[in-house]
Structures are given as C-alpha cells and as structure tokens.
C-alpha cells in the first residue's frame, strides 16, 4: 500500500451525491482565511476519529513533561542564565516506537497538521543535554522535484536531477518546529532551523542513504516573512510560483480517491508513477490525485487557493555545492562553508546572544508570552471552541 492510500470500507458510491459533497466541502474551506484553514485541519487531525483520540488522551498528555520550559519566565536573571546554559543537540529517531512518539509530539506542538511525506524520511529531536528536554522537532524528506526559485538558484537541469541523481543530495525540511514559549520569546524556531543542518544530520544522511547531503531546503506557509529570515544558514530565495492549494477533508477525498483509482486507472497510474533517478514515489502525488478529482467533478483548482505563496529557503552547505548539483564537479572537490564545518558551535554563538536580546526586549516592554502550545485539549472541542481558543495562536 502506498503512503497516500487508505483502506476504508467501500460504501455504495452515488456519483451526484458525492460530487455535491466534494464541492460543498471545497466551498466551505475556501471561505476560510489561511489561518482558519490551518487550524481547522489541526482540529480535524485530533477529532475526525474522536473515539480513538479520547482513548489515547491520557497517554498523549504525558508528552507535555518532555518539553523544555523556563523555570520562571518572568525572572529575568534566572531565565537568561538558563538560556546561556542550554546545550542543544540533535537526536535521530531510528526505531518505530520512538517514531510514533515523535509523530504524536509533532501533532501536539505544531499548528500545521502532519502528513507523512513520500520517499525518504528522517525524524529528529532537538534536545537540551543539560535537562534532557525537547526544544523542537525536525523532519527531512525527499526533495520536491520542481521548485522554481530553487531551481533557478542552483541552475540545474532535469538530467542533473534525475539521470545524474543530484536531487538525492538535497532534502526538504517538511517539519521545523520548536516548543513554546521557547519559540516566541527566545527565537526558538531559528535555533531548530539551524540544527537541521547539524553535522550529526549530515552524517546520518550519508550513512542511511549513501549520499552526501549538500543542502537543506524548506518553505514557509505565510510568504517570505517567517522565522527563517535573518538566519545565516539559510538563504531566502523568494516565493513559490503558485499559490497554496486548499486541500479537501480526508472524508471526501478518500471516497473520490478510490473512485478515480478504479475508474481512471490509466491516468491514475501515470500520475502516481515514480520518476527515474528519484528515490521514492512521486513527490506531490496527493495533489495530483486531487487535481484529477477536480477535473472529474468539474471545478478548477485555481478557484480554491488561498492568497499566500510559500517562502522558499535554502541552506547550501558548500561553497561550490551548486556546481556539484549541476554535475560540474565531483564529490571529492566539494568545499564546505566554514559555518557548517563549525556546526553546532557556530549555531550557538549566533543564536544565544540573539535569543537573550529578544527576551530582554520583550521583558522590558512587558510583552512576554509565557504560554506553552500543546493541543491536548483540542480533543473533544467543538470547532467553534477551537477557534475561540487557538485561532490567535496560528503562525505564532
């Protein structure tokens, strides 16, 4: 079974009824702001199978104690000392039980819903050695095959990506999230983003996949104004060419997914086929299936896009990394940038002063936000209750 497949029981399919349901769902979602859509998907993530979520709620709540928190965020002297003493490191997740725990924590601390990406997948904790607590999470996956501003920046060709296999030397960070209140008060998101380029990450990538990791890319949901701005590890490349598509609820998607798979088998096979030279299934395949459904029910994808383009960011770790990705030099000719040679030490020298200055400024201005962000109580909430409590937290 493929990652995008599901196995629900197959009810009787009424074409006109299901078409109406699908269009009504898309219209309902498109009437929301991007922030509201984001929260709605989060609410559904925990409430679409409420019985299961309720059974797991007590064990899920235990994850809260694993998260880093300042002892007393209003105690300026003590909090600054705690930041100075932080010793962040990356811990690679390498067994199924820990992978499940990582996913649960990811769903509890991040406003974006979680979808497992196709192909390669590396899940990472960013932890503090002193306390053992979690500072944030990272997931790295198979890079997207086409991304305009990135492709222009690198200057590579289709042959470079697939025939030469260079696309397997880059990755996209599908999750970069820090805990709160570390994020807002101490620029924790910037710290976790930097740690995605850690020497331990590069070492693991080489050991697991047999290829040198040249660069880490990522995107932001809300255009180019994001946590990635101003990080020396990442270059802001611009915005993605297209606006972000609104995705239907799983309940209506699954019904139509199985219908097109059965009744449009030839086109379905073509859309979901692997690309030669790329490790894993076609990236973006779920969106291709959604586009097939749009065509079938007679609606245009362009009518269901929100107003934000994605900001695109790229951590090129070698002075001549783009030349390697264009297949102009061999691996033994690569020259790593000094900041990535220095690794976590460089990151700490850059981040800690900025984190402390950010905290001091917020403290002086009375703008400290002490709240954590942990979505355990969204389980069992109505949609209206979830909006009232959490809508202002989206994008925090």
Give the positions of each predicted feature.
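Intrinsically disordered regions, especially transient/low-confidence alpha-helical propensity segments
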Residues: 1, 40-43, 65, 99, ...
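Long, compositionally biased intrinsically disordered regions
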Residues: 2-50, 55, 263-396
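Acidic-enriched, low-complexity/disordered segments with a strong bias for Aspartate over Glutamate
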Residues: 5, 14, 27, 49, ...
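Acyl-donor binding region in acyl/amide transferases
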Residues: 6-24, 33, 95-99, 103-104, ...
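Generic preference for hydrophobic/aromatic residues in regular secondary structure cores
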Residues: 22, 64-71, 75-97, 140, ...
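Low-complexity, highly charged intrinsically disordered N-terminal segments
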Residues: 28-131
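Long, compositionally biased intrinsically disordered regulatory segments in eukaryotic proteins
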Residues: 54-57, 62-64, 68-76, 173-175, ...
């Amino acid at each position: 079974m493929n990652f995008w497949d599901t196995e629900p029981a197959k009810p009787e399919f009424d074409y006109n009824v299901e078409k109406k349901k699908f269009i009504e769902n898309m219209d309902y979602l498109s009437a929301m702001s991007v922030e509201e859509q984001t929260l709605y998907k989060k609410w559904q993530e925990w409430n679409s199978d409420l019985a299961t979520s309720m059974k797991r709620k007590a064990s899920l709540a235990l994850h809260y104690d694993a998260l880093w928190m300042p002892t007393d965020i209003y105690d300026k002297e003590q909090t600054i000392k705690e930041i100075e003493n932080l010793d962040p490191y990356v811990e690679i997740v390498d067994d199924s039980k820990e992978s499940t725990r990582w996913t649960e924590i990811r769903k509890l601390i991040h406003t974006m819903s979680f979808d497992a990406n196709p192909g390669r997948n590396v899940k990472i904790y960013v932890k503090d050695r002193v306390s053992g607590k979690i500072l944030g999470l990272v997931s790295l996956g198979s890079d997207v095959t086409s991304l305009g501003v990135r492709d222009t920046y690198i200057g590579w060709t289709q042959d470079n990506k697939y025939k030469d296999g260079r696309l397997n030397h880059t990755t996209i960070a599908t999750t970069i999230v820090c805990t709160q209140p570390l994020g807002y008060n101490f620029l924790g998101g910037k710290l976790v983003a930097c740690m995605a380029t850690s020497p331990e990450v590069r070492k693991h990538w080489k050991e697991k996949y047999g290829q040198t990791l040249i660069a880490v890319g990522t995107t932001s949901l809300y255009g180019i104004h994001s946590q990635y701005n101003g990080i020396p590890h990442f270059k802001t490349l611009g915005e993605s060419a297209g606006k972000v598509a609104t995705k239907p609820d799983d309940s209506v998607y699954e019904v139509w997914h199985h219908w097109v798979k059965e009744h449009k088998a030839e086109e379905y096979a073509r859309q979901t086929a692997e690309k030669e030279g790329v490790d894993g299934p076609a990236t973006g395949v779920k969106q291709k299936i959604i586009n097939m459904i749009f065509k079938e029910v007679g609606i245009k994808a362009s009518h269901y896009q929100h107003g934000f383009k994605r900001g695109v960011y790229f951590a090129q770790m070698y002075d001549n990394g783009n030349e390697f990705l264009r297949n102009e030099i061999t691996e033994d000719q690569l020259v790593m940038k000094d900041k990535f040679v220095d690794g976590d030490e460089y990151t700490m020298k850059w981040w800690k002063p900025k984190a402390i200055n950010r905290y001091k400024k917020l403290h002086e201005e009375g703008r400290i936000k002490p709240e954590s962000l942990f979505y355990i109580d969204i389980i069992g909430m109505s949609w209206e209750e979830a909006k009232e409590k959490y809508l202002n937290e989206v994008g925090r």
